[in-house]
Amino acid sequence: MSMMTSTPTKRSVKLDDIWPELEEGIYKIITDLNKGFPKQKWIALYTHVYDYCAASQSKSSAKVGMPKQQASGANYVGEDLYNRLNLFLKKHMSQLLKLTETKMDEPLLNYYYTEWDRYTSAMKYINNIFQYMNRYWIKREIDDGKKEVYEIFILSLVIWRDCLFTPLKQRLTNSLLDIIESERNGYQINTHLIKGVINGYVSLGLNREKPKETILQVYKSGFEELFLTATENYYTNESAKFISENSVADYMKKVETRLNEEVKRVQQYLHQNTESELIAKCEKVLIEKHVEVIWNEFQTLLEKDKIPDLTRMYSLLSRIPRGLEPLRTTLEKHVQNVGLQAVSSIATNGVIEPKVYIETLLKVFKKYNELVTGAFRSDTGFVASLDKACRRFINENAVTIAAKSSSKSPELLARFTDFLLKKSPNNPEESEMEQLLNDVMIVFKYIEDKDVFQDFYSKMLAKRLIHGTSTSEDLEGTMIGKLKSTCGYEYTSKLQRMFTDMSLSRELLDRFNNHIEQVERSSLNIDFSVLVLATGSWPLQPPSTNFSIPKELQACEQLFQKFYQNQHSGRKLNWLHHLSKGELKTKYLQTSKSGYTLQCSTYQIGVLLQFNQYETLTSEEIQESTQLIDSVLKGTLTSLAKSKILLADPPLDDEEIAKTTKFSLNKQFKNKKTKIFINVPVLTQVKEEIDSIHKTVEEDRKLQIQAAIVRIMKMRKQLAHSGLMTEVISQLQTRFNPKVNIIKKCIDILIEKEYLMRVEGKKDHYSYVA
């Protein structure tokens, strides 16, 4: 048996009693809120809504024994009030719509935006009046799945959308598009108005699941799609007309301006999500559709060095797929041709100065590197094109073709480096040297035969160290450091050991001098120094001739030989007289009381000291006393005669020196300088040295190729011919480009030596023989 209980009741509130006052207040708020609304009136309206919705609680009842949650469920009312407000708002929309019938374009937009702003502001106010209904009756209806029920402010937007916006949508959108087009045509527009109307499109994108958020469906379907189509049509027509009447450079400026305008347009009054689609549409119409015309202008702009236009072209074409690829190819060909022409212009006489050659290469590189890093923003594709072009014109050009050798570039680069690092009145300032050495490394990066550079460089470094002609050891160390960072430790290991030998030689010479003073208790009577250099580290050739050292120098050599053998009993000294030098003091001249100091090679010293005993000597007599071979003797006598230290009888010409040619000291010798350098290198010796280096390089390459083949096959065990060729080239191309025919010969050599064998049954396959 159940028992009913009653609760105290509240006064019943009828809708018809409260609605007239609610309607009057709502109308006042909707139409004239800007004049203010009394707080007491607001409280009264809120109380009406509260009383009406809460009145049903007094009618609720509970049964004894009912579950708690069931008993507490409130039967709030509100449907009639909700429907009454719904009808009121729809009637208001109908009145607003009627007032738009004669309006179009900006007047229509002005009216619409004014009413929208008034309406949304008012409905936020009214929403607060109906807050109690929102929290209880409306929430319950929504929770129960009623699709047609909304919170009051959302309801107001739904009614605006369905009753006013939808009928006006086409006229509104057309008006917006017309005004935006007029702005594109250069007219001033009210961007605040446009932004306000468009924001209304966005606000009407209601999200049922998340009422406080909007979706862009209304904005996209009602405005954005039509706007993008209008944009495409506008720029299709404009671009076709403009490019037919103006230059490509002017067209690119126009496109750049238009793209910037569209970005600004989004910022001023469009939704931010529109930007990506809008710009993509503009890029397709303004750039992609005219890309062939733009590509075709690139070569002309390169030739005329139109940097601003090239910068703009890169910026525009980088926006579209594959827009830059033809430019990269064109740039590569252009730079290669410019480089080849530049080298050809300085190679007309067949003789090229290293400084002129390297500066010419660098001038081309720097010009286009500045273009790539600046206008093309260090784009990796353009960097690669520049690298390919430089590699081609640096390794194969008029100079290398004339020399019939791609190794000419590394040789000239080594000579240019020697020019920088060797003492000279023309040496650059030390502050400039770091940049100049960096310039050397730029060209070094592109030369293919880095082993040729290494051989020439080490040869020249050896001469600078032996003859003491380096600008500074710090700069020498800097250059070696740069080579090491580029090519690794192995590339510079011998160069670094050369410096070690120089340091050890200085220490050894100090000990020798102490030994002479303290042990031998004698004086050498001459200023004697010696460098002890390890054979494996120095690129030095043994002398090509015998040489009978003058008796004046014999004591020095013998004492040092004895001292060194006592220090290092297991080592052997080989004297390199052809690299040695010294100074002689003249005491025979009638023209100078103080005399001259002659800086000579040891061979020249050997010849000149003969004249301490004899007034005149024939070539044959000099050869007998010095033991020099004909070619070396001729070069030595020629250099002394050309320096006018010796007089020849008969005078020398380009023919061979006869054995009977007589030589005597020129006692009338005069020179403005007191210290005279006569160790002039002979051109034939330089040529022989170059030939020797190239021969050494070729032999070294064969050994390196064989070593690479063995390494690869030891790891792979078995490999096809093509695969082996590819791996060998890959391993060695950082030092030089191995030629295919040389690799084949090296494979045959290794098969003969039984390091490799051909695989039976498999054509062109090799296996490693353990």
Swiss-Prot record:
<dbReference type="InterPro" id="IPR019559">
    <property type="entry name" value="Cullin_neddylation_domain"/>
</dbReference>
<dbReference type="GO" id="GO:0019005">
    <property type="term" value="C:SCF ubiquitin ligase complex"/>
</dbReference>
<dbReference type="GO" id="GO:0000082">
    <property type="term" value="P:G1/S transition of mitotic cell cycle"/>
</dbReference>
<dbReference type="InterPro" id="IPR016157">
    <property type="entry name" value="Cullin_CS"/>
</dbReference>
<dbReference type="InterPro" id="IPR036388">
    <property type="entry name" value="WH-like_DNA-bd_sf"/>
</dbReference>
<keyword id="KW-0833">Ubl conjugation pathway</keyword>
<dbReference type="GO" id="GO:0031461">
    <property type="term" value="C:cullin-RING ubiquitin ligase complex"/>
</dbReference>
<dbReference type="InterPro" id="IPR045093">
    <property type="entry name" value="Cullin"/>
</dbReference>
<keyword id="KW-0832">Ubl conjugation</keyword>
<dbReference type="GO" id="GO:0016567">
    <property type="term" value="P:protein ubiquitination"/>
</dbReference>
<dbReference type="InterPro" id="IPR016158">
    <property type="entry name" value="Cullin_homology"/>
</dbReference>
<dbReference type="InterPro" id="IPR001373">
    <property type="entry name" value="Cullin_N"/>
</dbReference>
<dbReference type="GO" id="GO:0004842">
    <property type="term" value="F:ubiquitin-protein transferase activity"/>
</dbReference>
<dbReference type="GO" id="GO:0006511">
    <property type="term" value="P:ubiquitin-dependent protein catabolic process"/>
</dbReference>
<dbReference type="GO" id="GO:0006935">
    <property type="term" value="P:chemotaxis"/>
</dbReference>
<dbReference type="InterPro" id="IPR016159">
    <property type="entry name" value="Cullin_repeat-like_dom_sf"/>
</dbReference>
<dbReference type="GO" id="GO:0030587">
    <property type="term" value="P:sorocarp development"/>
</dbReference>
<feature type="domain" description="Cullin neddylation">
    <location>
        <begin position="700"/>
        <end position="761"/>
    </location>
</feature>
<dbReference type="InterPro" id="IPR036317">
    <property type="entry name" value="Cullin_homology_sf"/>
</dbReference>
<dbReference type="GO" id="GO:0030154">
    <property type="term" value="P:cell differentiation"/>
</dbReference>
<feature type="cross-link" description="Glycyl lysine isopeptide (Lys-Gly) (interchain with G-Cter in NEDD8)">
    <location>
        <position position="714"/>
    </location>
</feature>
<comment type="subunit">
    <text>Part of a complex that includes culA, fbxA and regA. Formation of this complex is dependent on the MAP kinase erkB.</text>
</comment>
<comment type="similarity">
    <text>Belongs to the cullin family.</text>
</comment>
<dbReference type="InterPro" id="IPR036390">
    <property type="entry name" value="WH_DNA-bd_sf"/>
</dbReference>
<keyword id="KW-1017">Isopeptide bond</keyword>
<comment type="function">
    <text>Probable core component of cullin-based SCF-like E3 ubiquitin-protein ligase complexes which mediate the ubiquitination and subsequent proteasomal degradation of target proteins. The E3 ubiquitin-protein ligase activity of the complex is dependent on the neddylation of the cullin subunit. Required at several stages during development. CulA and fbxA regulate multicellular development by targeting regA for degradation via a pathway that requires erkB function, leading to an increase in cAMP and PKA activity.</text>
</comment>
<protein>
    <recommendedName>
        <fullName>Cullin-1</fullName>
    </recommendedName>
</protein>
<dbReference type="GO" id="GO:0031625">
    <property type="term" value="F:ubiquitin protein ligase binding"/>
</dbReference>
<dbReference type="Pfam" id="PF10557">
    <property type="entry name" value="Cullin_Nedd8"/>
</dbReference>
<dbReference type="Pfam" id="PF00888">
    <property type="entry name" value="Cullin"/>
</dbReference>
<comment type="pathway">
    <text>Protein modification; protein ubiquitination.</text>
</comment>
